[in-house]
């Protein structure tokens, strides 16, 4: 089986892919944070109202909303301060321990992030959000096997409401590891569950392109580029390379014009102008 070190991508594709993995990481974390900002409460037999919350619930909830906002703005130390206050109110709060791990990861402190995730999993062993986020951290550390195990555990939970998110992360991680057959399978499943997601479509198209399935890759990248609010330099560059492989000169010209007009400072345009299509 092909391993990560033997996968050779064009230089610009490597740059675009690196940027996309980073952007995807932010998107995955922010998706999870939307849950953090919700009122913090344990499941009950009926709807939870404000009157059901304890003072500790409310204090922790306010702190978590503030922490999530600071994290999204890159104010990591301030976010940590708010998380500490949330944990004073509720010492075993799952959302706070998870968010602390995400902040440490963003600060470049993988050991502290790892410790926080392990703490969360000690308290909540089969929590799918924690398993997902820990899997993503392990993927960033190129710990492919353990990352895959966390994703699979998350997907195995019957109560999990976001399987397409984890299938996307799993597929991205498999692609980074050079396991393109497995990545194609995971991303195909993600697309079946969430066909409207541009992140799923563009990653699926990228893997299909790398697997030399150019017609299929064209179909999925066109879905993204057909929506101006979804297309970006990476998706246009991928489309251009696909059309070049398929020999459609008119489509290549169209993509190059769009790339030049919409993203004049992008590394993808620089790669195109330098003729670095297949380095």
What spans do the regions from the language model cover?
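Bacterial Sec signal peptide processing site at the extreme N-terminus
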Residues: 30-55
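Terminal, low-structured helical/coil segments at or just beyond the last alpha-helical repeat
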Residues: 42-46, 50-51, 226-279
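Structural marker of alpha-solenoid helical repeat scaffolds
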Residues: 55, 89, 123-124, 157-159, ...
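Alpha-helical segment of the N-proximal tetratricopeptide repeat
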Residues: 56-89, 106
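Register position in tetratricopeptide repeats
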Residues: 72, 106-107, 140-141, 176, ...
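TPR alpha-solenoid repeat register
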Residues: 96, 130, 164-166, 200, ...
